[in-house]
Amino acid sequence: MAVIKLKPTTPGQRGTVKVTRDHLHKGAGFAPLLEPQHQKSGRNNNGHITTRHKGGGHKHHYRVVDFKRTKDGIPAKVERIEYDPNRTAHIALVCYADGERRYIIAPRNLEVGATIVSGSEAPIRVGNTLPIRNIPVGSTIHCIELKIGAGAQIARSAGTSATLLAREGIYAQVRMRSGEVRKVHIECRATIGEVANEEHSLRRLGKAGVKRWMGIRPTVRGVVMNPVDHPHGGGEGKTGEGRHAVDPWGNLTKGYRTRNNKRTQSMIVSRRKK
């Protein structure tokens, strides 16, 4: 893949950087794996806003992605790589030897026509899914389960991966891209390699309208609101916050740690780096 910097012929194109999709499938998605997606625009059943900055956007179908990879021992051939509007990663349509087709997260360097397989006896090759107990220490992995059989939850977005550091008893230590080291059960599954579309971070939208296509509405600063609307609001002319920065509900922001999950605290060996 490559990036394209558009010429500044219009204000909207000035500074825009796109990622090429020449290698992706040009047609529609695989119909049996498409589901309708109804937009709620951040409103509840009463029409009240429950999540700000949501609404509008282009209609699109949801692609049903196989995050569990439970068809063990059955080889699958990669038929095509597709764009998925619901996520930053690309997806691959694979056809199993028994004729079933599924979508998976496309790893980097996975080519059309390649063969992948799942299960404890699968070889260590890009795109194959195995229990962590069978993956060599030091391997680069993605689509990692946190609960046995629950499906991948970690390292699913474009260009992400994790590193298997060690195995101790029934747990393995995995280092995330953030620097956090976490314990994962060795029976949880992971896929070899890293997620494709690593150039996604180089993309520049160029104009506000692209955000609206994505269903993201503008964010208004609190200091330009009235006191009734935000703790930072009010004042004559241009005034600052007059206090430490908070969100509309008065909770500290800008670095204040809000994580409070004692249930999984013991699974974190080292917190993420700032």
Swiss-Prot record:
Positions with biased composition (Basic and acidic residues): 229-246
Region (Disordered): 35-60, 224-274
Keyword line: Ribonucleoprotein, Ribosomal protein, RNA-binding, rRNA-binding
Record flagged with keyword rRNA-binding: yes
Physiological role: One of the primary rRNA binding proteins. Required for association of the 30S and 50S subunits to form the 70S ribosome, for tRNA binding and peptide bond formation. It has been suggested to have peptidyltransferase activity; this is somewhat controversial. Makes several contacts with the 16S rRNA in the 70S ribosome.
Chain intervals with Basic residues compositional bias: 50-60
GO MF terms held by the record: rRNA binding; structural constituent of ribosome; transferase activity
Record protein name field: Large ribosomal subunit protein uL2
Membership in a protein family: Belongs to the universal ribosomal protein uL2 family.
GO cellular component entries: large ribosomal subunit
Species of provenance: Delftia acidovorans (strain DSM 14801 / SPH-1)
Gene3D superfamilies for the chain: 2.30.30.30, Nucleic acid-binding proteins, Ribosomal protein L2, domain 3
Pfam families, A to Z: Ribosomal_L2 (PF00181), Ribosomal_L2_C (PF03947)
Domain of life (superkingdom): Bacteria
Subunit organization: Part of the 50S ribosomal subunit. Forms a bridge to the 30S subunit in the 70S ribosome.
Record's keyword annotation contains Membrane: no
GO BP, one annotated term: cytoplasmic translation
